[in-house]
């Protein structure tokens, strides 16, 4: 039976770091799949982009097509082994925020758990400014908070279409990373035990 745990958070929240560290400690065995990487691979195959950060600037129609292709690939993987899906609940595009999982996509993936990683907007802004490798939009702290609020709302919608449980984990600069990693480890261990 397919088994997916989705982990989301806006760029700069520390989602990938928390995921990497939690997977080193959990008893559960998950394959980490990055939704954006799969979309990027599909977009490169089609000749639409050459850099990952260009995907969010494609037309909404093309992005939705890429999302559905990615969902099908994730479903195939999750039928063989549990998947920890690293992704974004919403994506900021030039025209506004796009849902990371339109209804037809979330219904294909059908996750068991949705984990949201959050931090204070000032912490996220600082992390983004230190990460010069990525081509990220410049946002104010208010815009960052709005994006996190939209992620919560979107995640509730996803849970409605998949019956997934929702967990919010906070990742703060002052000892928050260790606590966040421990919380995710508990969720991953619990997720696998619930499925047994």
Curated annotation (Swiss-Prot):
Belongs to the archaeal adenylate kinase family. It is found in: Cytoplasm. ATP binds at residues 9-17. This is Adenylate kinase. Its EC number is 2.7.4.3. Its main location: cytoplasm. One of its GO terms (cellular component) is cytoplasm. GO terms for molecular function: adenylate kinase activity; ATP binding. Keywords: ATP-binding, Cytoplasm, Kinase, Nucleotide-binding, Transferase. Pfam families: AAA_17. Gene3D superfamilies: P-loop containing nucleotide triphosphate hydrolases. It catalyses: AMP + ATP = 2 ADP.
